[in-house]
Amino acid sequence: EDFYKNNQIFPDGTGPLLFGGFSFDPNQYRENYWSDFLSSKFMIPTVLYTQVDKEGYLTVNMMVKGQDSVKKHINYFEEVQKLVLCEEYDGESHISPLLLEKEEIGVEKFKGNIERATTLIKQQAIEKVVLARQLKVKFNEDISTEYVLQRLLKEQPTSYTYILEGEHQHFIGASPERLVQKQGDYVFSTCLAGSIPRGKTRQEDHELGEELLQDPKNLIEHDVVVHMIKEAMNSYCYEVEIPSKPSLYKTKHIQHLYTPVKGRIKEDVTLFSFIQKLHPTPALGGYPQQEALPIIRKLESFDRGWYAAPLGWMDINGNGEFIVGIRSAVIQQKEAVL
């Protein structure tokens, strides 16, 4: 490992990468539709394609033992090459399955939990807590994750599109939110909180954006996230750069208040150090962190699994990027939970 680090054989994002993530709360009970996903799971992919600027890199990983024959590995590589060069998936010809059922789970309980959380905030037991709810859908045939993935890539080009596949369940989504990125001696994070819809015209879109930039409620919500992330970054950085005012980050249907954060990392601080410190952010958990998690655990009657959790990759140099797993669904055959 030291040899690779010292000689910089691989550009960032290439070579043997670890891909995976963590559950939102490892102390929460596990539900059946998350049975393929442990509290943490990482893997090295067999085939990886990475695009860095205008250059593409193909990485093929294989396990080699001293007694193995060279021919065996050559044959293996040729089989992998055939797989990589196979015909591109044509999502346009796919016919969407028929939606049979759509159920909002625990609506009344969710409303009651909002009232309880509001009471706790008024009593100053917590500054902010974010509660989630579920939507369950069922189709007439198995859901094609390839089709969903292609649609997300096409419709959400400014988001991080991801899929983690298990034996029975698949977690898929398109998140706009970076948790942390490490590049050498520098680390980057994103404060993304406060939102408003996109406009139907360019003028309406501009006016809505300006309204968001001046809205007191959304600015306060955003400042809570900025404050928490700044505190976390200061713990592990020599210096931290944060703009004084947020700007706008626009996706297809919504625009957010956005503040980028950059820091120069102290020695012996790893990417996982930042993940542990930053997760969960106030936008998906609450503030302060230690007070918010037990409240979520008590009020929510379901397992978030890997929803709103850190997902990403790390290379052999210790660089990498993790996002927050939102705008997502866990899919199992004909059913999905959003």
Labelled PLM ranges:
Residues 20, 49, 124, 180, ...:
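A residue-level signal for conserved active-site and pocket-lining positions in enzyme catalytic cores
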Residues 100-107, 138-142, 198, 215, ...:
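Hydrophobic alpha-helical scaffolding
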Residues 91-178, 225, 229, 236, ...:
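Active-site pocket-lining segments that scaffold enzyme catalytic pockets across diverse folds
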Residues 52-84, 174, 181-252, 327, ...:
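Cytosolic ligand/metal-binding cores
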Residues 175, 258-338:
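Conserved hydrophobic core element of enzyme catalytic domains
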Residues 116-120, 151-155, 195, 211, ...:
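Generic, well-ordered alpha-helical scaffold segments in large soluble proteins
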